[in-house]
């Protein structure tokens, strides 16, 4: 089991890549290690399915809880469905890999990354991305690599390479950059309202580090005796493409200049042109080369027609600076927005439409117990802001089975979630758990950025005090040789024909999220900088349109939203509030009809649809946790009587005992001779014994309510109590 280990010194750390030792039957395998984090990545190729017209690439990231020394909490004590984090890392591996395979590749390719050990100082995702390239190269699959990825953080004014989990949480930037020798091929980022210039500098900083990991992979290939060359482009029979260009260029070109057509009208006209060309080919002689090509592969006409349409659209953008809907390259489609369109049973709602893309977002306010428990390897706490994205088939005029959310839906939801997190109010002042759901009602490009805009509207409509509203735009790019055109607010057909999909979200102050995917093997940082800068006026324009609809949070919450009171108690007294077996807190919730959550730090949150009930529960808890001192005077009710004395509730939930000898200056034979259950009495704290029991006395205390010392704490509501 001997293998080859290569060590790369990287920003003060060592990255170890071991090849030739693990998974010997896989096409290629590498164990990548840094600190105590270890990820095994394999790449395997097998013959593709006959007639496939796409690249069947599968990337899977697998988490094993033993990697963090944990046993799964499921009934079977075995890992089940991949958690969201694993799905997102699978996408993170797929996105920079996919554009690096040749366009003719149709073989099945599977990349599997398994996290075997996790060090909290070294996140596993970027290691898995880099190792996926190395495994693919070792498998000798046709591939335009090497490719590598790094993470860039920002602590204060300093960029940090591959920060720890804790540094990511503390910092203002979480940026993943993947690149090849040709340039940057993928970006994924969350930022705390950073300027465009800061983000551009971070991308440049990250790409410099990427080049070092690329050199390490090239060195390993050389030591392994693998002579890696860029894949050769397969020769394509140009008979049919040439025929379509000759007979279809004019009608397609004329159609693409009819800017007044709707998407549906244009699609129907294109289908009509394709049908006419097909009929023309059918009329050719049987021995005609074009007809033979179609007969051997019926899908060839559709594929070649799409390629010609794509080619002509790109030419029109490069030469004329005009898009299929007549917009200028930097022009945003028509914006419409509405807030509060659903009944207030829904706590907040927003409708956002840009061109034919329409998204309905809803916001729901929940209690701390509604937080999402994260059963994965991420050491971060439970999620208190959740965004779910749904993409039904009717949104693109199609029919298909409705199943559980796929990777794309999970990824788009995570991007919209990331865009809003920097502007959410702090938990101390607004302790609600928030869930936003974005329903894509119609899709024609950039539904994820539509979800960002719709989410902002819905949250403001729900009364959530956002630090600033967030908008987003998707940027595209056409690259023909040295000619480059950047497109603002791309629609679906431009996503199909273009070379880049670059989503930028942020506030008026700065960027909160980025996501860039490529169809080419890399872009210079300068081109990426141009796209980021061109996105700013688009974001600002969209934000202005949104602000015309709603520019600040509603002053009152929905009457159907829970009301919360939040206050802090001594953490050492949490057990007192909970009581043996939870009896005390259960009694409070039943008595007041409230829901109570207590965090380890002593923060108590009370949820109720009745503000008065919440205040009553707060009084009881503060009474239980309030320290009582000798000599204090309280007025309370007799709760029970025993032969040697009577118990008085001096504070909500807190009792003291009056010994029979302390009921009167005179001798008392029976407790009932002086007091009975329900009597209101004024007592003084005589002593607190070493077991914390409160001993009271009536002796020398005037039975006058003016003498009472009963604190009335002022509630600290974090949301209006209506």
Swiss-Prot record:
Pro residues: bias regions: 712-722
Compositionally skewed regions (Polar residues) per UniProt: 701-711
Cofactor(s) the record lists: Mg(2+)
Main subcellular location: cytoplasm
Alphabetized PROSITE patterns for the sequence: KH_TYPE_1, S1
Domain called KH: residue spans: 562-621
Binding site for Mg(2+): 495, 501
Enzyme class: transferase
Enzymatic reactions: RNA(n+1) + phosphate = RNA(n) + a ribonucleoside 5'-diphosphate
Keywords: Cytoplasm, Magnesium, Metal-binding, Nucleotidyltransferase, RNA-binding, Transferase
InterPro entries linked to this entry: ExoRNase_PH_dom1, ExoRNase_PH_dom2, ExoRNase_PH_dom2_sf, KH_dom, KH_dom_type_1, KH_dom_type_1_sf, NA-bd_OB-fold, PNPase
Positions of region (Disordered): 701-722
GO molecular function terms listed in the Swiss-Prot or TrEMBL record: 3'-5'-RNA exonuclease activity; magnesium ion binding; polyribonucleotide nucleotidyltransferase activity; RNA binding
SMART domains: KH (SM00322), S1 (SM00316)
EC number: 2.7.7.8
UniProt GO cellular component terms: cytosol
Domain S1 motif intervals: 631-699
Gene3D superfamilies on file: GHMP Kinase, N-terminal domain, K Homology domain, type 1, Nucleic acid-binding proteins
PANTHER family: POLYRIBONUCLEOTIDE NUCLEOTIDYLTRANSFERASE, POLYRIBONUCLEOTIDE NUCLEOTIDYLTRANSFERASE 1, MITOCHONDRIAL
Function description: Involved in mRNA degradation. Catalyzes the phosphorolysis of single-stranded polyribonucleotides processively in the 3'- to 5'-direction.
Protein name: Polyribonucleotide nucleotidyltransferase
